[in-house]
Amino acid sequence: MSEPIDQSEAERHRAKMAKRKAVQDAEVADKTIEKGLLMVHTGTGKGKSTAAFGLALRMLGRGHRIGVVQFIKGAWHTAERDALKKFGDQVVWHTMGEGFTWETQDRSRDVAAAERAWAKAQELIADPSFSLIILDELNIALRYEYLDLASVLEALTTRRPGLHVVVTGRNAKPDLLTAADLVTEMTLVKHHFSAGVKAQPGIEF
């Protein structure tokens, strides 16, 4: 059990928190812009796509419609897709990839799949019924130059003002990071895979 706080310590804490609240309130009041955000989840750590789907859940809770295009993941069945599809036509999900590049081992096939995925992404971006578009593993397609970076950036930066877009995947291009409103880098500190623990249902897929 913790020691009781004396009156002087309680007062110091109250004054400190009041000052902190005043600073926070001033910072919040200063922010007046409302716009669709371009968000990038990158880095070597786990959780880039998972974070994007968590954001999707929040948008769905607000009654918004979301679209998902997966650029790399192909036949790999994921539980998050099953969960989000329960929202019916509030969620449109397209898995366009054919697996990771080391699985296909066919560049022309990978390029064709990426181009199909990007065409579908552009359809969703142009559809005013969507509030959030998740471009899962687009960074990988850009890294291997399956798509033209300049064309992708043009489409993302000239999209309609209210549309939010999340791009996921390792090795995000510097120009994409510059264009983004929010960049989160997942840093690998420790991963169970290195200890011989396999991918598990509900954790990895």
Each model region followed by its residue ranges:
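Conserved P-loop
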Residues: 39-126
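Short gly/ser/thr-rich secondary-structure transition/capping motifs
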Residues: 21-24, 115-119, 165-168
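Residue-level preference for short coil/turn positions at secondary-structure junctions
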Residues: 34-35, 62, 129, 161
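Generic detector of well-ordered alpha-helical packing
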Residues: 71, 137-138
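Glycine-rich phosphate-binding loops of nucleotide-dependent enzymes
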Residues: 134
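Short glycine- and Lys/Arg-enriched binding-loop motifs that mark or flank ligand-binding interfaces
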Residues: 32, 41-43, 59, 165, ...
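Extreme N-terminal, non-catalytic leader segments
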Residues: 1-38
